[in-house]
Design a protein with these regions (language model features):
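C-terminal binding/interaction regions
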Residues: 81-138
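Acidic-glycine-rich active-site phosphate/pyrophosphate-binding loop
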Residues: 24-42, 96-102
Length: 138
């Protein structure tokens, strides 16, 4: 089953967008789904329901960061190479969705919904598959 389909099922079962995306990659991350679920709980509805950065996008950034980090705690050395890749992910998400913030995506101020939450979850997963795991359409 595709990650995007797994994530949508999780979202339909009550996970927030960040939880749905992050937990869909538990196996690839080598992490426990319960821990990922807890870690991403506060990222729903644009960070704690503030309508800030989309939760699905935040989760995608967490996945990419986890895969790129060298985890050298005594000498953090991978930030410089990770940040540009995160920026590329942000640009790709914005190109596909039309915005980065939940407020703008949901059209809170304009009344113009750019993308439904389920589609944001799907797009975030597709971008992770393509940009992090180099899998197109799998």
């Amino acid at each position: 089953m595709k990650h995007e389909d797994i994530a949508v099922i999780k979202r339909n079962n009550g996970y927030n967008c960040a939880q749905a995306v992050l937990c869909a990659y538990a196996e690839e991350l080598g992490m426990d789904e319960k821990q990922l679920f807890a870690l991403s709980e506060g990222f729903g509805s644009g960070l704690g329901c503030t309508l800030g950065t989309c939760g699905a996008l935040n989760a995608a950034c967490m996945i990419q960061s986890a895969m790129l980090s060298t985890c050298h705690l005594d000498h953090p050395d991978s930030k410089a190479s990770t940040y540009p890749k995160i920026r590329n992910l942000l640009k790709a998400f914005e190109k596909n969705v039309g915005a980065l913030r939940c407020r703008d995506i949901k059209g809170i101020e304009t009344g113009n919904v750019l993308c439904e939450c389920e589609d944001c979850v799907r797009i975030a997963c597709r971008l992770v598959d393509e940009m992090v795991f180099d899998k197109k359409g799998e």
